[in-house]
Amino acid sequence: MSDSSYSDGAAAQSARGTAPRPEQAAPRLMLKGISKQYPAVRANDDVTLIVAPGEIHAVLGENGAGKSTLMKIIYGAVRPDAGEIQWEGETLEIASPAAARKLGIGMVFQHFSLFETLTVGENIALALDEPFDLKALAKRIREVSADYGLDIDPQRHVHSLTVGERQRVEIVRCLLQNPRLLIMDEPTSVLTPQAVRKLFATLRRLAAEGCSILYISHKLDEIQELCDTATVMRGGRVTGHVKPKEETHASLAQLMVGHSLPDYTRREHNPGEVLLDVKALSVTSDDPFGTSLDNVSFAVHAGEIFGIAGVSGNGQAELLSALSGEKRGASRQPADAIRICGKPAGRLGAGARRALGFGFVPEERLGRGAVPAMTLSENALLTAHRQKMVSSGWIRAGAMRAFAKRCIEAFDVRCGGAEALAQSLSGGNLQKYIVGREILQAPKVLVVAQPTWGVDVGAAAFIRQQLLDLSARGVAILVISEELEELFDICDRIAVLAGGRLSPVRATGATNAEEIGRWMAGLFGGREGTAPSAGHPAHV
């Protein structure tokens, strides 16, 4: 494919057309009576949805509400059992994603569909339905990445990318196809506040050119700022249509979950002794495209929640592996570079750190937090085997089931019981189980990565309250998250990791999202932190 095939923006705008006034426009997309039944659940039940040209339309609902199934039906990845799809006034069937793309429908999935052994450019090329030239495509990828504030190298192999960086690939891949309907599922979780504003400006420009946008997000402030209308789903059915700008956060949340959400219960912050102490930690990344840690120091006290913000790919993976015990020794750090409950732990393995009272919730739920094809009982064994689940080398299946049941009940995990497969749970329920599995072991120090990434507002509120309750019991908690709202909601102090360096530390009440956003771009300095050097670029 030639360069002009990718870079002719005027042609793309002409293809989308100028957005007509909503009252004059026939719907770009109309769904009537869409239903989809799976063996254990009715995912969609008589769903009707209308999206106009140039409209930014939100779809709201809890995990398991049927949003993802509906989007997959629109994109041709799932066939409905009943109902009618109209595209620009014509009744048709969307038999496959290729057919959807030919119509002009693009989708950014929350759960990624990338080949790990291929490069970014090769993965994007696979989504194109026409001949391509990898060199020209790489140039266009860089242009789009720069336009949208999505830092990604087309030559990198996907297996070397963090979760956040993989989402950037999905966004860029979709935008390269000049869609007439763009479906975006949680697209801003990897962006700084400044980059979110840039993305929103681009989406508004696309809408002004006539591109319709279906926007799925759990960030209610984003929906209120960006979206013209919203369809609310619960239990597979449409329960209402609203204009988000005329609603409050509380009313939108209540529409989603069917009841009002309780306010977070916080106690006065009276920090105790230091339970997690990191001093001058420098770790060389094993990944040639990774970000090495450079002289990172911080302390987390008993009864405190300490938050580290930052865009994915700035050393979070390296810090997490160093803290968890997965990476030790290779950094040639002294043993006391990491101290847990006063004990040198820098050269201890993961099991020895847990014996000191360390708990850990990884970023990836499926694959690291839980084995997809194993039951919840079996997954309990992964980190909680010290809870009398093993005796004289024998696994005690009854103890495993009892622990899993206790976790399910205590943390309101909605599933088919202790023998349900991990992969059968929604993201929110699996995350509640993984967090609960750690909390039930009564850790003294808990490190949590992305605790509510892709989780609905109900499950997110539950998880955050559990962390607040745990800190009130004297546990030292480190939360590494890209969700600024989350960090401001629950953290006592906050810092930013950018380019492998840690920013100054602030009391949460003494800073704001604008300052943290600048720090996420590497724009900080001073006695407690130094702006990233040329060798440690900040990924924004």
Where are the model-predicted features located?
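Glycine-rich phosphate-binding loops of nucleotide-dependent enzymes
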Residues: 2-540
